[in-house]
């Protein structure tokens, strides 16, 4: 989900302002609360909105979820994009584009209609990951300090992906950028909790991976036969609860 097109924009003091709709790209008019974005049609059943940051993705996703019209099948956030899947028999691409533009401008209704309700989760974690000492060293703190900061953070599921049930967690309380492993592991055990960039996350199943592993959880992150297979969904909040912390 990443395409780059530059269209008729003016930059003043590093802020994109006074932008217009050109060649089907929805853009920001500089109004307070408005988001700068580009929109691309993805066939006849979806639109892709590109933003400039993860923070804008979270804002746009929340606005869309709070004002979802009939005909929207799914709203899928990612690191810099939001994909809106729709039924064109109920909601045309033109109408969907207008709705997304309204949400981006801050004009869309904040009254939830049939949006899903975000859930709060508390996940047990044992800080026994093989990379925890290395991560503490990289962040110039003690192992105990790393554990304390990770536990203190209130995490939000920004988006899901990579593997079914894998949630990319972000937090305003977490201000660290953790580099990925230089050599990814060919097999990461299910339940492994890791860090990469600004994200934390837990592996729902055994899979290759390059995140720095700091712990493990026994939480049922993905159950294929359940009504809702994935435990975590975008917008949910997560707190980690220490289990078996080594003193």
Identify the meaning behind each predicted range.
Residues 1-5, 23-247:
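Conserved "landmark" site that anchors the functional core of diverse proteins
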Residues 5, 10, 15, 20, ...:
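Intrinsically disordered, low-complexity repeat/linker tracts enriched for polar/charged residues
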């Amino acid at each position: 989900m990443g395409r780059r097109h530059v269209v008729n924009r003016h930059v003043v003091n590093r802020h994109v302002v006074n932008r217009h709709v050109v060649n089907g790209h929805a853009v920001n008019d500089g109004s307070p609360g408005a988001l700068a974005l580009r929109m691309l049609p993805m066939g006849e059943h979806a639109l892709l909105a590109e933003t400039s940051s993860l923070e804008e993705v979270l804002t746009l996703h929340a606005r869309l979820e709070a004002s979802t019209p009939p005909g929207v099948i799914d709203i899928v956030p990612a690191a810099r994009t939001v994909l809106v899947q729709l039924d064109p028999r109920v909601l045309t691409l033109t109408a969907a584009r207008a709705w997304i533009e309204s949400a981006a401008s801050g004009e869309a209704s904040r009254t939830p209609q049939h949006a899903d309700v975000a859930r709060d989760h508390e996940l047990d974690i044992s800080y026994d990951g093989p990379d925890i000492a290395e991560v503490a060293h990289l962040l110039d703190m003690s192992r105990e300090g790393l554990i304390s900061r990770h536990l203190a953070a209130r995490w939000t599921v920004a988006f899901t992906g990579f593997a079914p049930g894998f949630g990319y967690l972000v937090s305003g309380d977490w201000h660290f950028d953790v580099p990925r492993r230089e050599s990814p592991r060919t097999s990461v055990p299910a339940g492994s909790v890791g860090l990469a960039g600004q994200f934390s996350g837990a592996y729902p199943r055994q899979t290759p991976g390059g995140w720095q592993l700091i712990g493990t959880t026994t939480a049922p992150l993905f159950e294929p036969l359940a009504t809702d297979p994935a435990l975590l969904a975008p917008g949910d909040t997560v707190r980690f609860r220490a289990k078996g912390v080594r003193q």
